[in-house]
Amino acid sequence: MLKRDVEKEINEWISNDNRALLIDGARQVGKTFIIRQCLENSEYTFIEFNLIENEKVADILRNANDVDDLILKLSLATEKKIVPNKTIFFFDEIQVYKDILTSIKFLVDDGRFKYILSGSLLGVEICGLKSAPVGYLKTIRMYPLSFTEFLQLFNIQDEIIDTLRDAYTNQKEVDSYIHERMMNLFNLYMIIGGMPAAVDAYLKTNNIDDVIDIHKSIVEQYKVDFTKYESEDKKLIISNIYDLIPAELNNSNKRFNIADINKNLRYEKISDSFVWLYKAGVALPAFNVTEPKSPLKLNEKSSLMKVFLSDIGILTTLYGKNCKLMILNNDKDINAGSIYENVVAQELTNKGIDLYYYNSKKYGEIDFLFEDEKGVVLLEIKSGKAYQRHSAINNIKEIYKAKAVVFSKENVSFENDILYLPLYMLMFVEKENECSIDLNINKFKF
């Protein structure tokens, strides 16, 4: 059975958290499936209401006089027995009635039941709420399958993963056979991506045409969602931005050029359209920084950004079937820079890492920057054989004392204070640990 990384957080919530739980994410990333799986394996009885399929329940939520009235009416809407302290209510597709989030405080305060909520476009919808339930709601964002999750489908032994982790940690070369096998699997991941329906189609038929059909269907669903934006002109802009992403990633610097939408537009006038795509979970940003220095957020210039698709399989589908074939065959003529950068952005975002990039006329461009517990990490993504040519990293790592890492198709090595890693080792990159700060007031007394 496929395990998702988010299961651990959901199970911890079931066991130890009295708040309501909100699972957010783009369409078809597997939210409903994993919630059901966790609830079925728990000690609780769960009652699921889909607010699209069951409009009466949405009306009950909308019109209930108080908590007691709500519970009474919900008990009439299900054949399952509702037992205090032993029942979890699962409300799916809550974008139909987003105001349930403003009422969740009263349900949580009541304390008799647990509540889990899910839906699509919630990142967008929540922005319009009059009153957000601060302190009463735990939120988890789900993404397409990561490469680590994808690997489960191929029965890779734990010993192999442990060997790779050791090579990553100790900067040791990987056995050539294992390295080749892992790169082939990573290539397959870039072709199929992490959308569960596409992965399932591949496993059932091994037919890439079925995968492509799934991807195209998902994109069409996204475009229907774009039309739900409140103003007609912005519906068109959102759609145009999304359609342009694959081409914009083929720019020499990968930066999204606003003039390609309309030469008379300025970012400030359409910034909310980009934010809509990010909050909907269908696009991922990497913002420019004016200086590769911690804290990166302080140096962010949000009007300059790279924009990536949230699923690498969808990107390679939009590039065409021949692109997928060239990836699978390791064709040396493929221009894979945009593909490699997108998969890196997807993997790191999945880990909760905020992404930035740096571009200087004096020093050159760094593809990605992020922060770990030791400071800024410089990432270069190389798709060809010249993976050791990176003048920008050479210049910047010395000036700013930053850690430098190059991801490519090649094996592990460490030269001139630069760590070279194969792309599949993205699975071992971790988010910056939260620092523990001692705020004992006695330390500040004279």
How does the language model describe each region?
Residues 200-366, 370-373:
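Accessory nucleic acid-recognition modules appended to NTPase machines
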Residues 114-120, 141:
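Structural recognition of the conserved hydrophobic beta-strand(s) that form the central parallel beta-sheet
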Residues 34, 38:
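Hydrophobic positions on the alpha1 helix immediately C-terminal to the Walker A/P-loop
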Residues 1-15:
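Pre-Walker A adenine-sensing motif
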Residues 127-250:
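Interdomain motor-coupling "hinge/lid" segment immediately C-terminal to the ATP-binding subdomain
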Residues 53-84:
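Short glycine-rich substrate-engagement loop in P-loop NTPases that contacts/grips substrate
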Residues 23:
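Hydrophobic anchor at the beta1->P-loop junction of P-loop NTPases
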Residues 31:
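Conserved lysine of the Walker
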